[in-house]
Design a protein with these regions (language model features):
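Glycine/serine-rich anion-binding loops at beta->alpha junctions
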Residues: 42-79
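Short coil/turn segments at secondary-structure boundaries
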Residues: 36-42
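Extended polybasic, low-complexity segments that bind anionic RNA or targeting/receptor surfaces
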Residues: 1-35, 80-199
Length: 199
């Protein structure tokens, strides 16, 4: 544990309503969404190149292809194309404001802990020692470090309920989904610098 002052401009912001938080949360999830669904249109379904019957004289309705969407085995009308873009745009200023609000709520709930630093040799025991020293062993945690080195990634990758994040990649999703947020001192300084109002 370390003694560190949390800047009120970042960790004590008034949250009038949660609408912006919700927008930022949904924006993160939408950007993470993978598009897998894909259906074939009448032009993509194999076959159907020949006209089923002549245009006139049969008494039946006219059709140009057996892959017509209203036929069995035909294409799909207005189905998913596989190239949908679900991202929801949010301005940088709005994102930063939302993160400040989320951190303020976390601070108010006593979820923020500051440690001196996280020096790792790449061993899991380094991360375990840090977690035990913070007293947050059985909770969903995010650990903020100023730089994600390979050693730090190796040290934390085997631990359940722990996510390693660098300050500029911090999101409302990370904060709201965590029961505890652990800052190293350098990461705290970098976060405050990044989220300051006057940029």
């Amino acid at each position: 544990m370390a003694n560190a002052k949390l800047d009120d401009a970042v960790f004590a912001v008034e949250v009038a309503n949660h609408q912006l938080l919700r927008l930022a949360y949904d924006s993160y999830l939408a950007a993470s969404r993978q598009v897998g669904a894909k259906t074939k249109t009448r032009g993509e379904v194999r076959g159907g190149g020949r006209k089923p019957w002549r245009q006139k004289g049969t008494g039946r309705a006219r059709f140009g292809s057996s892959r017509n969407p209203i036929w069995r085995g035909g294409g799909v009308t207005f189905g998913p194309s596989g190239i949908e873009n679900y991202t929801k745009r949010l301005s940088k200023a709005s994102k930063r404001t939302a993160i400040r609000q989320a951190l303020s709520l976390a601070n108010k709930s006593g979820e923020i802990t500051v440690v001196d630093d996280f020096k790792s040799t790449g061993k899991t025991k380094d991360a375990v020692k840090l977690i035990q020293s913070s007293g947050l062993t059985d909770r969903r945690r995010i650990l903020l470090v100023d730089n994600k080195t390979t050693e730090k990634i190796y040290a934390t990758s085997n631990l359940a309920n722990l996510e390693l994040v660098s300050p500029t990649y911090l999101s409302v999703y990370h904060i709201l989904n965590a029961d505890a947020i652990i800052f190293t001192k350098p990461a705290l300084e970098a976060t405050i610098e990044w989220l300051k109002e006057d940029k």
